[in-house]
From Swiss-Prot:
Gene3D superfamilies: Anticodon-binding domain, Bira Bifunctional Protein, Domain 2, YbaK/aminoacyl-tRNA synthetase-associated domain. NCBIfam families: PRK09194.1, proS_fam_II. It catalyses: tRNA(Pro) + L-proline + ATP = L-prolyl-tRNA(Pro) + AMP + diphosphate. The lineage of its organism: Bacteria, Pseudomonadati, Pseudomonadota, Gammaproteobacteria, Enterobacterales. GO terms for molecular function: aminoacyl-tRNA deacylase activity; ATP binding; proline-tRNA ligase activity. The gene is proS. This is Proline--tRNA ligase. Keywords: Aminoacyl-tRNA synthetase, ATP-binding, Cytoplasm, Ligase, Nucleotide-binding, Protein biosynthesis. GO terms for biological process: prolyl-tRNA aminoacylation. Homodimer. HAMAP family: Pro_tRNA_synth_type1.
Length: 572
């Protein structure tokens, strides 16, 4: 590609509304342009990277035995009503009616569509297992799209769905997808981890996320220092304390706390250790519990894990917190004064709360707290469960080492769905015994456009993007100095351009009438890994200058050796 025939579209200024570095650099490098909130046009440089990612994904899916299909973005509402997700999915599901007043959705995912397809195409166990994938646009009506393509409303995704008659067969495909995903992200030179995860709205049993490590990531992922245990913080189990509860040393007393409406204010004003305080959170109770609200207790320095809480049978799904109006109607006090003593609601305490003694909590009276609370003296020990997020230093759930926490960007997710969709949609085949059998399913997704942003978060400096070779828009940039005035500079540039292209190298020849500084800055900004500078002075000694974008080193290479040298440097 020649820059004179290309839309480079680079920008010097950083857009004010771009929060994360990947969004900033994708705009500055001319990869994307915003059309509307959460909607982006991909420009030529962005498309080249997107296609590189897409091709790696497609190759590894094919290598793993998956079969490519293409399903419609627009889906009939009756399939979502049949699966039960019409009500469950929420406002992220964009719904509309056609001119015939028939309801449809823009697909955020395709479990319903693929299940409908396969129940009409597959009728015997002999045809299974099969694994189908597509790389296609999805739409989720995010309440607050942000971070550019990292959390956009429209995005490119690879989604795959496998069908089986046994759990053993599903496990084999699941393992194959785990391996394929590891190969995909390794080929892109991404620093990633596969972590245990919650299945979320997709449903099913076993699940792993593939997380690219980055400070800008939205997810907290935990690792053991003593084993290969890794999990999303939502999934990570907080082990119950093994030490017994200390005996009571304080009397129960009620204290005026008019200016302490949060744990932080309580700790600051009364110089309490935060680990000696308890937060009381009221959530809506399951309708079969006989109560409207249920109280959840966590230690003052811990955070409630909403995923764990939502799985409790006493808690309504999805988990929702009580409003201040509801709290006052039930308790007679505001949210900042809640506590377990004399509380006329079901109470569930975290394991760490159950071993506390002499602790402080709200008195269920505005502006008052109890200090010196002790279980089995001042109140009965409630139900106990794992309710909190793990913290650094916790014992690993496998008992080996302690936990560390890092930030990650989720770029892939694999699920063992089981019969969640096939059973309700009556997707059956004739089994080996001649009877109809519900198919078992797996589901495997990669956020293709999100991978592009995640790669930038890991690969950049103050001058721009530093692409790994495998997904760079161009692998080599040829920068001829004054080629429009020097015949031999132009001749070598054209010869090198033609030769590299014949070797299958993606190369960009900067044939603009621009100052060298502009040419260098643009190629650094868009992240070309290998740069060749051709100048008259160096040609006197039959040399050109090579610069590696990642390490920044320059070296002189003989013109007769440059092609062989570049082929040895490019990771293909």
């Amino acid at each position: 590609m020649r820059t004179s025939q290309y839309l480079l579209s680079t920008q010097k200024e950083t857009p004010a509304d771009a929060e994360v570095i990947s969004h900033q650099l994708m705009l500055r490098a001319g990869m994307i342009r915003k059309l509307a909130s959460g909607l982006y046009t991909w420009l030529p440089t962005g498309v080249r990277v997107l296609k590189k990612v897409e091709n790696i994904v497609r190759e590894e899916m094919n290598n793993a035995g998956a079969i490519e299909v293409s399903m419609p973005v627009v889906q009939p509402a009756d399939l979502w009503q049949e699966s039960g997700r019409w009500e469950q999915y929420g406002p992220e599901l964009l719904r509309f009616v056609d001119r015939g007043e028939r309801p449809f959705v823009l697909g955020p995912t395709h479990e319903e569509v693929i299940t409908d397809l396969i129940r009409g195409e597959i009728n015997s166990y002999k045809q299974l297992p099969l694994n189908f994938f597509q790389i296609q646009t999805k739409f989720r009506d995010e309440v607050r799209p942000r971070f550019g393509v990292m959390r956009a409303r429209e995005f490119l995704m690879k989604d795959a769905y496998s069908f089986h008659t046994t759990q053993e067969s599903l496990q084999e495909t699941y393992d194959a997808m785990y391996t394929a995903y590891s190969k995909i992200f390794s080929r892109m030179d991404l620093n990633f981890r596969a972590v245990l995860a919650d299945t979320g709205s997709i449903g099913g049993s076993a699940s792993h996320e593939f997380q690219v490590l980055a400070e800008s990531g939205e997810d907290d992922i935990v690792f053991s220092t003593g084993s290969d245990y890794a999990a999303n913080i939502e999934f990570a189990e907080a082990l119950a304390p093994t030490e017994p509860r200390a005996p009571a040393t304080e009397e129960l007393r009620i204290v005026d706390t008019p200016n302490a409406k949060t744990i932080a204010e309580l700790v600051e004003q009364f110089k309490l250790p935060i680990e000696k305080t308890v937060k009381t959170l009221l959530v809506h109770a399951h309708e079969e519990s006989g109560h409207k609200l249920v109280a959840l207790l966590v230690r003052g320095d811990h955070d409630l894990n909403e995923i764990k809480a939502e799985k409790l049978p006493q808690v309504a799904k999805p988990l929702t917190f009580a409003s201040e109006e509801e709290i006052r109607a039930a308790i007679g006090a505001g949210p900042g004064s809640l506590g377990p003593v004399n509380l006329s609601l079901p109470v569930i305490a975290d394991h760490s709360v159950a071993v506390m003694s002499d602790f402080g909590a709200g008195a269920n009276i505005d502006g008052k707290h109890y200090f010196g609370i002790n279980w089995e003296r001042d109140l009965a020990l409630p139900l106990v469960a794992d309710l909190r997020n793990v913290v650094e230093g916790d014992i690993s759930p496998d008992g080996k080492g302690t936990l560390q926490i890092k930030r990650g960007i989720e770029v892939g997710h694999i699920f063992q769905l089981g019969t969640k969709y096939s059973e309700v949609m009556k997707a059956t085949v004739q089994g080996e015994d001649g009877r109809n059998q519900v198919m078992t399913m797996g589901c495997y997704g990669i956020g293709v456009s999100r991978v592009v942003a995640a790669a930038i978060e890991q690969n950049h400096d103050d001058r721009g993007i530093i692409w790994p070779d495998a997904i760079a828009p161009f692998q080599v940039a040829i920068l001829p100095m004054n080629m429009h005035k020097s015949f031999r500079v132009k001749e070598l540039a054209e010869e090198l351009y033609t030769t590299l292209r014949s070797h299958g190298i993606d190369v960009i020849l900067d044939d603009r009438k621009e100052r060298p500084g502009v040419m260098f800055a643009d190629m650094e900004l868009i992240g070309v890994p290998h740069n060749i500078v051709i100048g008259d002075r160096n040609l006197d000694s039959e040399e050109v200058e090579y610069k590696n974008r990642r390490v920044g080193e320059k070296q002189m290479i003989k013109t007769s050796e440059i092609v062989e040298f570049l082929l040895s440097q490019i990771k293909r």
